[in-house]
Amino acid sequence: MTAFYWMQFYVDPSAVPMDDVVKGATDALVSVGAKFRDTTKHKAIDESVPTIQSRWSHTVGTPSFSEAIGEATRDLKGRPVGSRAQFETYDLGFEMPFEFDQEVIQMLRAHPEVRDENVARKTKLDFILDSDPALKEKIVVDFRAWDEYVHMYGNPATHHRNKKLILMLAEALYTRIHPFYGWADDETNSSDMSYDSLLAGKPPVENEFTFVGPTLRGKIGMAVDLGAGIETKSLTDGGLILHNYGRYPNEQPRFFE
């Protein structure tokens, strides 16, 4: 199974229009040097079984960037919570300016399913409306990069620069789409394990990076004792980025220095 680096942001659709979320997210990618490449529609072939058991069809398209943004917006609006949305998804494909060491480039070019290192620079962006325990609904903005090449193989200094690029994207996304919460982590921790902890007043130690917007911060009061191993960065709107550096205590340099 391909290893991905995952990042998700939760946006309140009553506070930020869906059109602005899609446009803001795509603008954020462009702002850090990403290039739009294509779209992919994924559809479950057999909707009578759980999605994890179904076979899927994948249709790649190459519309213009503006057409892709329009289609992603219509797709988000057309899949309300409780619909059969889980059986269809729509991805926007971008190419990020990740760095690869020469040994990794050779590895990628020798890979039977890759042959070209630019394939490992490809990332996916998608949007879905979902239920939320604190709000009625939330828009989930989902970003994925190819973790095993971007962060695992090659020189640690190269990995660090690639991760800093992803964090630049995270801040650009945060600034443009105004989420109340977000998380980012590697393939072995590729799910949100911190939101419920924050709502319960516990420190979000499960994910490497957590983003707390001003609305959520006001709701929970940030009376959470973060404890050792978590450092914070304040954002211009009063939000915070929490970095669980205790996960990788020897990683240098630190991200918030």
Task: Describe each PLM feature range.
Residues 29-37, 164-183:
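Structural alpha-beta junctions
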Residues 154-155, 185:
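A short secondary-structure junction signal
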Residues 7-16, 54, 58, 145-147, ...:
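Short beta-strand-to-loop capping motifs
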Residues 1-47, 51, 253-257:
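Short, extreme N-terminal segment that most often corresponds to the first beta-strand
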Residues 18-28, 68, 156-173:
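Well-ordered, non-membrane alpha-helical segments in soluble/globular domains
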Residues 39-48, 178-193:
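Short, glycine- and small/hydrophobic-rich beta-strand elements in well-ordered beta-sheets
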Residues 60-147, 164-167, 171-174, 186-257:
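Aromatic/basic-lined ligand-recognition segments
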Residues 17-18, 48, 52-57, 61-68, ...:
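Alpha-helix capping and helix-coil boundary motifs
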